Amino acid sequence: MTPRVSDPFTGQSIESARRTLAARLRSAQLEEAELDARILLGAALGLDLTGLIAQAARLLTEAEASRIAQHAQRRIAGEPVARILGTREFWGLPFRLSDATLVPRPDTETVVERALELFREQKATQQPRIADIGTGSGAILLALLHDIPGAFGVGTDLSLNALETARGNAVTLGLADRSAFVACSYLAALRGPFDLIVSNPPYIPSAEIPKLSLEVREHDPHLALDGGNDGYDAYRALIPQAAERLAPGGALIVEAGQGQARNIETLLTAAALVVDRPPKADLAGIPRAVSARKMPP
């Protein structure tokens, strides 16, 4: 049961409420208490940072104080800020979330970076076809469509809720006419050929999920986390299907968990794909975006 948090914000100014909220979050041992407080306060009041500063002395209304208290209660209970707001920025673009989607993380931007790197290096077709497997909110696919004019993309997911969320994000970003979303397992409903296939598949070993942070294990969908006994179930299913549906010269890019990149490269090679460069690392130096090509006959 979510613990109740009293409302200490009624009658406070915006600046006083910010300090109170930050103190409460610090007391709950939340690492980014100051940043979380500013974001949650701004969301509750409909103000950006400039607005919070400009109106710092204004007293809160009763409704505003109630909203701030609700945000505080949810954050102290371990709910991520992005879940509370229902949105997260990825690749500089806003994405709505749902219970069926992961919160897009900066680590996954390495997949987008590697894809754009490959497109710059080769003479891609004027209308490249992209598939995003396990699309969730559509973050990877829609980021690529945003940056690759003329590309058309298909996102697949088992969750109808996730697909609805992805379609909504495509509409918001003005990319609905260049994207489609299909309910299926991996690439089962797709024929290809595709110039690029991308995926952030579930890769957490089943036994490790209870050890994840509260924010992840209680608020991210387990379908998008659980990679089976050793964490490689999704890769074993995805890679052979992707190899069959890649166009000659096309590339497959997948996100890897910590310590998984080398084993994934072995699976790629076993599917007759060519690993022609090292994985792209995230900001912590962990190899994340693992890629391979289907060589022309």
From Swiss-Prot:
Belongs to the protein N5-glutamine methyltransferase family. PrmC subfamily. PANTHER family: HEMK METHYLTRANSFERASE, MTRF1L RELEASE FACTOR GLUTAMINE METHYLTRANSFERASE. Keywords: Methyltransferase, S-adenosyl-L-methionine, Transferase. It comes from Bradyrhizobium diazoefficiens (strain JCM 10833 / BCRC 13528 / IAM 13628 / NBRC 14792 / USDA 110). The keyword Iron does not apply. SUPFAM superfamilies: S-adenosyl-L-methionine-dependent methyltransferases. The keyword Transferase applies. This is Release factor glutamine methyltransferase. InterPro entries: DNA_methylase_N6_adenine_CS, HemK-like, N5-glutamine_MTase, PrmC_N, RF_methyltr_PrmC, SAM-dependent_MTases_sf, Small_mtfrase_dom. Gene3D superfamilies: DNA helicase RuvA subunit, C-terminal domain, Vaccinia Virus protein VP39. It is an enzyme of class 2 (transferase). Substrate binds at N200, P201, P202, Y203. Pfam families: MTS, PrmC_N. S-adenosyl-L-methionine binds at G134, T135, G136, S137, G138, D157, N200. Its EC number is 2.1.1.297. GO terms for molecular function: nucleic acid binding; protein-(glutamine-N5) methyltransferase activity; protein-glutamine N-methyltransferase activity. Methylates the class 1 translation termination release factors RF1/PrfA and RF2/PrfB on the glutamine residue of the universally conserved GGQ motif. The gene is prmC. It catalyses: L-glutaminyl-[peptide chain release factor] + S-adenosyl-L-methionine = N(5)-methyl-L-glutaminyl-[peptide chain release factor] + S-adenosyl-L-homocysteine + H(+). One of its GO terms (biological process) is translational termination.
